[in-house]
Regions:
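Conserved NAD(P)H cofactor-binding loop of Rossmann-fold oxidoreductase domains
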Residues: 15-26, 69
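Short alpha-helical oligomerization interface
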Residues: 26-42
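Amphipathic alpha-helical dimer-interface segment in Rossmann-like NAD(P)H-dependent oxidoreductases
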Residues: 38-61
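Short-chain dehydrogenase/reductase
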Residues: 47-51, 92-97, 134
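Catalytic loop of short-chain dehydrogenase/reductase
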Residues: 56-102, 119-120
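C-terminal helical subdomain
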Residues: 112, 118-167
Length: 168
């Protein structure tokens, strides 16, 4: 809830990358609330804040925000609170991107990063290595594509673009 306190620091940033939040297997109500707040609503606040900074920016350099959502937008996850929160931020990012007008698109770029299961502290059973995933993100980052998809699941590459096409 204190995202706006970072505004003066974010003005110096050209590319803001929002990655993971929390992954808690507890089925208590407070866990669902925390997951939605941290994994979705906080990221959406940062998205809106950074957009505001970008649109007021006088520099010729476009500001970019890259937001890691998840395959949980289209596929079930082992953790319901994670699935709900990641699906929500995915929908909010799509909503925001689809409603950027032409002038805003000249100053502000939104990229959605969709990662399949990679090995991390949050996911010790992930099948992709962090090194592989980071290299693929780096390789795809300079493309003009809105979606940066890295997954061992071929359905993700098929379903995500179709889903995005029909959003809003």
């Amino acid at each position: 809830g204190k995202e706006s306190k970072l505004k003066k620091h974010l003005k110096k940033v050209d590319i803001l990358i929002l990655n993971h939040g929390i992954y808690n297997l507890s089925r208590e109500y407070s866990n669902y609330e925390n997951s939605i707040q941290i994994n979705a609503l906080s990221k959406f606040k940062f998205l809106n804040l950074f957009e505001d900074i970008a649109l007021k920016n006088e520099s010729p350099t476009k500001k970019e925000i890259w937001i890691n959502t998840s395959e949980a937008e289209i596929l079930p996850a082992l953790n319901p609170s994670y699935e709900i929160s990641k699906s929500l931020i995915g929908k909010l990012v799509s909503f925001k991107k689809n409603f950027l007008d032409t002038d805003s698109q000249k100053k502000f770029i939104i990229k959605k990063i969709i990662l399949g299961p990679f090995k991390s502290e949050l996911n010790p059973i992930g099948i992709m290595s962090p090194k592989f995933v980071s290299k693929k993100i780096y390789d795809l980052a300079n493309s003009r594509n809105y979606l940066i998809i890295i997954s061992p699941n071929p359905l993700t590459y098929l379903i995500f673009p179709v889903k995005e096409f029909f959003n809003f």
